[in-house]
């Protein structure tokens, strides 16, 4: 039985659930014998600290402090290019559309690591990722609260 978690506390926990499943996709099929294509970490932007991850029931969780800004560190763990379709709170990090597999993503070169600090507003501007309450989240304010707290990454070989 799950212990109850207050709404603000739950909103402050970023779920990395999709990553543990989707990052293990290899050429369209998941296999337990192959290592994941992608490593994903949350990085607190002010301190540069990588947030701890805790696994439970096939998902990974990282506790965050309300109001803290964070970046998502994507590391390609292969010797080939991969496409990462990234979403935060169910919103595509590049387009701002409700997240889906066939959307625009980030192409990472072999062994490349990059930090994504927010939703892309233009080529020069972003809206920073920030731990906040459900009601203050961008997704909830735009009528899409179902996936608040979820960081998702669909990873595809080129």
Question: How would you label these PLM feature ranges?
Answer:
Residues 15-26:
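Bacterial N-terminal signal peptides
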Residues 29-158:
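Intrinsically disordered, low-complexity segments enriched in small/polar residues
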Residues 9-14:
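N-terminal export leaders
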């Amino acid at each position: 039985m799950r212990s109850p978690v207050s709404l603000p506390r739950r909103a402050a926990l970023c779920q990395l659930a999709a990553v543990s499943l989707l990052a293990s996709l290899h050429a369209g099929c998941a296999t337990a014998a192959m290592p994941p294509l992608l490593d994903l970490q949350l990085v607190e932007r002010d301190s540069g600290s990588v947030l701890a991850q805790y696994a439970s029931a096939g998902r990974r969780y990282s506790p965050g402090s309300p109001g803290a800004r964070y970046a998502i560190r994507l590391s390609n763990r292969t010797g080939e290019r991969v496409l990462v379709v990234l979403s935060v709170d169910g919103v595509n990090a590049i387009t701002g559309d409700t997240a889906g597999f066939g959307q625009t993503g980030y192409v990472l070169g072999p062994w490349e690591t990059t930090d994504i600090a927010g939703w892309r507003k233009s080529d020069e501007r972003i809206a920073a990722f920030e731990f906040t309450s459900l009601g203050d989240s961008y997704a909830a304010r735009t009528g899409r609260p179902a996936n608040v707290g979820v960081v998702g990454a669909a990873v595809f070989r080129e």
